Design a protein with these regions (language model features):
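A short helix->loop->beta-strand "cap" motif at the edges of active sites that frequently abuts
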Residues: 25, 94-96, 177-181
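Proline-aspartate-enriched helix->loop->beta-strand connector
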Residues: 148-157, 161-162
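Short Gly/Thr/Asp-enriched flexible loops that form oxyanion-binding sites at enzyme active sites
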Residues: 111-112, 166-175
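A transmembrane-helix-recognition feature enriched in membrane-embedded lipid enzymes
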Residues: 61-66, 198-255
Length: 262
């Protein structure tokens, strides 16, 4: 499987169709620009990514970045797109039984009903919307593990936001022996329940989904998009310089010294 490296993370260079054909088991993460910035600063988040079997590019900005680096990623595969594609792909596969963990009270249950109605069978067999701060409550986490293990689910979709969802999967994956596929999918459960409005398709296609989200939740997201994520472009430029210098092996050794410091 071909990989594309952007900053300190390798992405799987797959189309949506290739991913669905290949996925039989494993951990699926959908990194975006915000993930890459957090990975630079958060060792526990980076450690959580070490168990990921599939890193799917969930950002048009990262698609542009991969082209800038000379290693284009085939396709943007967001969590909110891949999940409906996944359950439709396995529509007749009785072995796929999904547990939804995340979203606000009652939202996951609404998503369950909507998905099962679309599919025509009870593919989503159980849900749970955990309380705020659940990840710090070991007793609550153990209750969640028991719920999942007793549900009969083979697929776990966790939608509690990054880096919380990835860290939770990393910590408790081995306590969930019946789960074959783990997916960390952010706001996907909210989207499936029609609880949160998605960006217009044209905005997603040109890389402006972040702007739609910022305008929808300015108080929560302004710092992420207007302060934290701006750092990404500096890091990307540094990576490009390194690649350029590596190609020019006849250059001045002083340039190599500069590259090593970047």
């Amino acid at each position: 499987m071909k990989k594309v490296k952007i900053l300190n993370l390798e992405f799987d260079n797959l189309s949506k169709a290739e991913f669905l054909e290949n996925l039989e088991s494993g951990v699926v993460f959908t990194p975006n620009v915000d993930h890459l910035i957090k990975l630079e600063k958060d060792p526990e988040f980076l450690q959580a990514y070490s168990i990921s079997d599939y890193n799917l590019c969930d950002s048009k900005i990262l698609i542009y970045a991969s082209k800038f680096l000379g290693t284009p990623i085939k396709e943007k595969i967001s969590g909110s797109d891949i999940f409906p594609a996944f359950y439709n792909y396995h529509k007749k596969n009785e072995e796929i039984k999904i547990f939804l963990l995340g979203a606000g009270k009652g939202v996951a249950f609404t998503a369950q009903n909507k998905i099962n109605k679309k599919i025509g069978r009870n593919m989503v067999i159980a849900t749970y919307s955990p309380p705020f701060g659940f990840e710090h409550d070991e007793k609550e986490c153990q209750n969640i593990i028991d719920m999942i293990n007793n549900s009969g689910a083979t697929v776990l979709v966790v939608g509690v936001g990054a880096p919380k969802q990835e860290k939770w999967i990393y910590k408790y994956k081995d306590s969930l022996p019946f789960i074959k596929i783990f997916m960390a999918l952010g706001a996907t459960i909210d989207f499936e329940a029609d609880n949160v409005k998605r960006a217009p398709k044209w905005m997603s296609e040109v890389g402006l989904e972040w702007l739609f989200r910022l305008l929808s939740e300015p108080q929560r997201l302004w710092k992420r998009y207007l302060v934290d994520d701006v750092f990404f472009f500096l890091l990307l430029f540094k990576q490009k310089i390194k690649l350029f210098i590596k190609k020019d092996r006849k250059g001045d050794s002083r340039i190599w010294e500069i590259a090593d410091r970047l």
